[in-house]
Amino acid sequence: MKRYKNVRNRDINGILLLDKPKGISSGLFLNKIKKLFNAKKIGHTGTLDPLATGMLPVCFGKATKLAKYLLHSDKRYKVSAQLGVSTDTFDSDGTIISVSPVQSNDYILEQCLESFIGIRNQIPPMFSSLKYRGVPLYKYARKGIYFPRKPRSIHIYNLSLIKKTENIIELDVHCSTGTYIRSIVNDIGEYLGCGAHVIELRRLSVGQYISSSMINPATLEAIFYNDSFDDVQVFCKLDAFLTPMNMIMLELANISNEKC
């Protein structure tokens, strides 16, 4: 059954809180969601690496004008990192560039994590979607071309150890927008003198939106591919997952009042 045959892209408005799966870029994932909803206008509020999973708020229609508020909201992550191994991308998708023994103890690790809390400068990684002369930096990096990057001010509100198993550490990170978790992990590895890289990364919240509100994209696909539903029924069922504009505006107003 071919969906939406001879149906124009729809003008729909709202925010969809999606749980991005592992192994797909935010851009490709966004295109997939756009096709499922047959939406005319869509945008997200900050990319997640292909390796990463978790909260990706997707804005439809008029809600795209409000995306900047979420883009500049603080974020919370759970990250697992392997100590003793460094990669060129700072995560397990990259090439291993060094292997070193891990000699730090729990006390040194706690001191390390505490040193990151607060306002600090962070140099964005070359393997990132930031652009130089209109070209993403990661495309240069893949060719072995590296450029100096200007440090950016970030704020780490919390960086705490959840658990440690041999050379694998699991961390809770609450940070400002624009923070690269991969770079934090790489810097932790440098502090400890052994190197480190991200092996798992999950975004738990964006601003006021938390992980318990997320929708699994498999739920949306099950509706889309259900032959017992016609297009109108599919639209109704999918649209029910959207946070409507009036609720979004109310939430933003409440946030503004809390900051006053």
From Swiss-Prot:
A Pfam family per the record: TruB_C_2
Keywords: Isomerase, tRNA processing
Segments traversing the membrane: none
Record-listed substrate binding positions: 44, 77, 180, 201
Reactions listed under catalytic activity: uridine(55) in tRNA = pseudouridine(55) in tRNA
GO biological process: mRNA pseudouridine synthesis; tRNA pseudouridine synthesis
UniProt-annotated catalytic positions: 49 (nucleophile)
Lineage top rank: taxon: Bacteria
EC number(s) stated in the UniProt entry for this protein: 5.4.99.25
GO MF annotation list: RNA binding; tRNA pseudouridine(55) synthase activity
Cited function: Responsible for synthesis of pseudouridine from uracil-55 in the psi GC loop of transfer RNAs.
Family: Belongs to the pseudouridine synthase TruB family. Type 1 subfamily.
Protein's UniProt name: tRNA pseudouridine synthase B
Gene of this entry: truB
